[in-house]
Curated annotation (Swiss-Prot):
It is a lipid-anchor. Residues 1-22 have a biased composition (Polar residues). This is A1-specific pheromone. Keywords: Cell membrane, Lipoprotein, Membrane, Methylation, Pheromone, Prenylation. Mating pheromone for A1 allele. Residues 1-40 are annotated as: Disordered. GO terms for molecular function: pheromone activity. Pfam families: Mfa1. It comes from Mycosarcoma maydis. Disulfide bonds: none annotated. InterPro entries: MFA1. It is found in: Cell membrane. The gene is MFA1. The modification Cysteine methyl ester is found at residue 37. Its main location: membrane.
Length: 40
């Protein structure tokens, strides 16, 4: 599941990465931002 999410998040990784403080709420997708935090 993480692998698939990571691949899909890679395209929109710039957005959550820019706001690592609160990617959950700032990002359009809660799971996408969360995955970025966990993977990072």
């Amino acid at each position: 599941m993480l692998s698939i999410f990571a691949q899909t998040t890679q395209t929109s990784a710039s957005e959550p990465q820019q706001s690592p403080t609160a990617p959950q709420g700032r990002d359009n997708g809660s799971p996408i931002g969360y995955s970025s935090c966990v993977v990072a």
